[in-house]
Every structure is written in C-alpha cells, then in structure tokens.
Amino acid sequence: MDTIVTPSDHRAEGEAVSTASPRDYFDLMKPRVMTLVVFTAFAGLIAAPVDADPFLAFMSILCLAVGAGAAGALNMAYDADIDATMQRTRKRPIPRGVVSVSNAYGFGVVASILSVLLMALASNYLAAGLLAFSIFFYAVIYTMILKRSTPQNIVIGGAAGAFPPMIGWVAATGEISLDAVILFMIIFLWTPPHSWALALYKSGDYAAANVPMMPVAKGAKSTRLQILLYSIVLVIFAGAPVLTGLGGAVYGATSLGGGALFLLLAWRIFRSRAGEAGSAEEGALYAVRAGDKAARDLFAYSIGYLTVLFAALIVEHAFGAYVAIPGVSP
C-alpha cells in the first residue's frame, strides 16, 4: 500500500529543494491546460463585435495566460499530497522535489497579482475583475473546498475554466453580453463529460488519493449515465451561437458534425463497462478494458471537439468566412 504524502510533509521537504529551472516553473503552470485557456480566450476576443487594438489584445491574452498558469501553480501547491499519490501526477514539479510548496505558493500569488494588474492596465477593470475571480474560484473554491469534499467538484468548479472566452470578450468590448455568456456555458457544460471520462479510466488513482470524483463516490454506472446526459445538453447548447448570429455556417456545420461524434462516443461509454476495473465477474475483464478505451476516446476527442468548435468562430470572424444561415441566423 502506498504511503500518503501530506501537504505538511512536502512543506517540510521544501526547505531542502534545490533551485528549480525555468522549465520546472513553466510545468507548474499546467501548460497543456493553459494552451486551451488561451485559445478559447482568443476566440472570445476575436468573435467580439469590435476591432480590438492588436497590442492591447496581445497583452490581454498574455495576462490571461499568466493568470491561468498562476491558478495552476496554486492548485499544484495545495494538491501536493494528492499529486504525490496519483500515478498520473507523480512527475509534476513538487512531487519530484524540484519545486517546494512554499515556492509554488509564492510564484502563484505573485503571478496572480501581476496578471490582474496588467489586465486592468492593458484592457479594462471588468476584464481584470473577472480574471481575479476566475483565479480565486479555481485556486480556492474548487481546489481547496470542492475537490476533496463533493463529487460535484467538477460541475461547480468547471466555472473557473469556462471564464476565458468571456474574459476575452470583455477585454475587447468592456461588457458582458449574451454571446459571452453562451461561450461561458459551452465550456461549463463541456467540463463534466470531459473530466468524468478521464475519471472513469483513472478511478483507481482518484480512489487511492481519496478524491471523491463521480466514479469513486457514485459508481461507474451513474457516471456513465451523467456523461451521456451532459453530452446531450452540451451538443444542443453548442448550437446557440448560430441562433444569436455569433456563429455562421462554418460554426454551424462544425457544431453539428462534431456534436454528432461527441454523442456517439458518449453513447459508447454509456453502453460499456468503463470504470469497473474492480469487477469480479467472470469474463468481465475484456468488457471493462473495452469500456475504458471508450472513456479514453471521449476524453481525447473532447479536447479536439472544443478546440475545433472555437476555431470555427476564429475562422469566421478573423478571416471573413462568416456566412449567415438562412432562416436560422438573425
């Protein structure tokens, strides 16, 4: 049985940690997550109905990237015990012993403050306020409160990851509009099926770390059903930009085709035995492995789905490819 490493253990070890490289601090910012954050924020900024100053737009996106990275660093600092326990996260900078918990906290706090202040100077106070709130929501509300206490952690905490396109929109326009809320809601609804697909085939990892993800707390069968239900709502809601005129024919086709495949993969999970690795039934091993593959497929595809969906908005608004859909677009 693995030994659980507590935050205090890492805090004590942190004093002896050698000087980390810039790459270690970059890894602390969760660069893969940060990339998707920046991309969706850029889509929100580009889709906004104004011509933003290129330099100020660049600075706004940079501030959002730093803010997202700062939130990631604070998350890793607080979750040092969990990361040391889970196979998926053991190679992160803190579990590897190259960055101390105290240094990660310091880095996260300083980067958070700088990103918010620069956003206020480069863009507007509303965008800066939303950035500050999203950092707080992820680092405190989700990481410190929800993640370890409720299987709804991802549902509620997903709001933090849904803010980037809204912040990009507000950075350009200075106001929150219906379209900005729609972009927020698309990511908010996307987060549960995306995260629970991962949690299904990594349920043993989460159970070992005592993280009450949905498969651990409510079981694999309930999780598979909820993935399907959230996927249906997501795919339907993803068509909303067409109804408001934000998305045109390119976006509509992307949403329709991408959504159909999303639902197919979600249905495969629902009909599978994903997340039942502990099943003792005879002959269950093959079915469970096939189910876990279905969960892996949806997890991987969901990232591409969201990327292509927002890329369609960029193509329409940045490259003049917007074509209204007769009888649908206003």
Curated annotation (Swiss-Prot):
Converts heme B (protoheme IX) to heme O by substitution of the vinyl group on carbon 2 of heme B porphyrin ring with a hydroxyethyl farnesyl side group. This is Protoheme IX farnesyltransferase. It holds the Pfam family UbiA. GO terms for molecular function: protoheme IX farnesyltransferase activity. It catalyses: heme b + (2E,6E)-farnesyl diphosphate + H2O = Fe(II)-heme o + diphosphate. GO terms for cellular component: plasma membrane. The chain crosses the membrane at residues 33-53, 54-74, 101-121, 126-146, 154-174, 180-200, 227-247, 250-270, 308-328. The keyword Iron does not apply. It is a multi-pass membrane protein. Belongs to the UbiA prenyltransferase family. Protoheme IX farnesyltransferase subfamily. It is found in: Cell inner membrane. Its EC number is 2.5.1.141. PROSITE patterns: UBIA. The gene is ctaB.
